């Protein structure tokens, strides 16, 4: 996109003369708009089970004991004044009827009686008109005779009150964020995720080896749906969020989330796109509905169930059911999977990537698995943030799917990631962090509850975020790999076939925990850098990406944010400052005109120099003191790449076989 802003992409923008943070001009927008094998699916946020036996033990991990900073009188803790319940605005009968239909029992074919507002509030509120008076039918349960209170699209302040008052383990931190606990599950449960397999999805979806899609039948889904709906209807109150996915106004999706916890409601308030009052008034019937009954287990003896946890997606009914896990990330990633199904039907590519834009309108995509630096590198003081995790690439350009960011917090430091640090304030959800019991200051280094601590905040909490979160077509596609083997160059320029090869491979390397006594790095491959969430075969997404990169003249890059001078344990991690210099050189275009030389085995083109980066690390073998060890390690990694890619060799990519042949030839060459 040209820097004069003449090109429109879902909401015009221009650059004002007033300087923003770090001399970056502000955007002015118009209102609108066990160790897994190589064939297994890589999961970004799986966490081991929390080491506790009771709920009280879990809560005891959350708060660190310390001497109080202010003496307490009479040896008692200072009290907190009570807060009033949430306000109850005038009810929309249409909204209540719509929610009642969402919560209808499939057996009784009637929705619950709904009241808008907090059941603890004394205020009189309107309710859904009851159907004509008749004698109770034989299949009416006690829950069908009561009213269920609906807390619809509450504000963050109201959700804070609900969480602190009714959800044990909810606290306000020293910076104003809401600290919560997700219970026994502190990460996603991919082995408990199910997708309904019917005549349509059997033909369309990716099934079998390497696929994240584990089948279930329609009947079992309906059993779990009924269990979830009955549980939600048995509660005195439920939280309902009506929100959107995708900032592209022509392709946004209406989603409804029905949940039992204020924590879940606030999480989705932050992560989805928040509607205006006018949009909410005319919201109507959602395109997709989530029933989050995570506090209630599924029946593990039900067909296709393997535990008390089940996360079920029915693409035909456009519904998702969550039972037996309170980890909020299941909702976020469940919807991402749905977008991976819906968007390609509209010829729109859904991407697990970060995205930012320079002041001249140049857009970059960042692909990478957990720990590669995707969020860190896409959040750049000198560029506008379009999004940190989920995007769409359409004929109009790129758009963020979400309305918020979900950042890892482990070892978070103000000096290393100031934007994320400063975003943790009022309205932000902090999951499973440990804090001082008196000062409420969070210790981001403490892993007592889990290593997978997270912060969920609205994207506008990032100072340089671009609202609306849309941009022109990308100029650069950056593939990030944290190579713990230490043999990949810090920066490589890729041709189209190489870009597709590494995109389909989705490589990074993990280091086993010290408790296992293993220090060798482990290669991990996740197709399209997000195999845990994709619905179609990876080659379908690769074909779409190749087509769009060709049409827009985008350049592919492979950036190693891992080790240099040796593998993990002998080498050293490439400094973040060097990686930022490399990324800056990509953005500026200087690397396009650099001189390159080609590496052995992988055939990667590496620049002879990058300003601000030591030349000795650009060629990996030069940084290794033991050259023979380097050659052996390089061959080992190349073999792992080839073994992983065997799954895809029989699939055609694109309209003809030429691209497929080029991609196969772009892999390691022994």
Swiss-Prot record:
It is found in: Cytoplasm. The modification Phosphoserine is found at residue 66. PROSITE patterns: PEPCK_ATP (PS00532). Allosterically activated by calcium. It may represent the only case of a monomeric, allosteric enzyme. Ca(2+) binds at residues 269-270, 403. It comes from the Eukaryota. Residues 24-95 are annotated as: Disordered. Expressed in flowers, siliques, seeds, stems and roots. Substrate binds at residues 188, 327, 333, 454. Pathway: Carbohydrate biosynthesis; gluconeogenesis. ATP binds at residues 333, 352, 368-376, 417, 454, 573-574, 579. Involved in the gluconeogenesis. Catalyzes the conversion of oxaloacetate (OAA) to phosphoenolpyruvate (PEP) through direct phosphoryl transfer between the nucleoside triphosphate and OAA. This is Phosphoenolpyruvate carboxykinase (ATP) 2. The gene is PCK2.
